[in-house]
Amino acid sequence: MKFWSRFIGLILIAAMAVGCGITHSIPQGKYLLQKNEIKPDESVPRDERITADEIGRYVRQQPNKRFLGTNFYLWTYFSANPDKQNWWNNLKRRIGEAPVYLDTLQTERSASNIKIYMDSRGYFNSEASYSIDTTSRRRAIVTYRTKQGRPYRIGEIRYRFRDRFLAPIILEDTAASLLRTGNVLDFTVLDKGRSRISTMLRNSGYFNFTI
């Protein structure tokens, strides 16, 4: 028990020391990106809600990696002397990670990308906004909030064939189709449906066709 208490105490002391060292290394006027928070639209039913993980893929800036709750990689990067070329400093540069400073242009682009993604999922006129909180220690937390638009749903599915020989091949496999009436008009699902039909036709010996 004493060992773990001392170990945890050392970790906390190291974390405080690392944090102070990093703060002094951050240039004036810049903020270290500490965290991205994503707030999905909880007014949407869970089975149709676009999740934080999905939204997070469209956030362009990600904070530095952490180790045992500390900015170890960032501290290692800052502690390397750029004017000295030796194995110790080279090792620090390889292990370390360059700081990710808040770039509001990238933040705006992230919000725009999130909106485009939600629209492509069938939730047209969606909204994506963000807010930035900064601290006296020159850290920044970016919070992205989303509002999914009213979903457009598939009312009817029709197939039109220029080549009548294709009809039985495609219609025979409609049970495996990803498209269902009543589902949200998700363009990512439409693309998967096109790919599925293309693969099926090629496997049947057809190569010159358009979908």
Feature map (PLM): residue ranges:
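C-terminal motif of bacterial Sec signal peptides marking the signal peptidase cleavage site
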Residues: 16-19
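Sec-dependent signal peptide recognition
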Residues: 3-13
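Interaction-mediating elements
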Residues: 3-4, 21-211
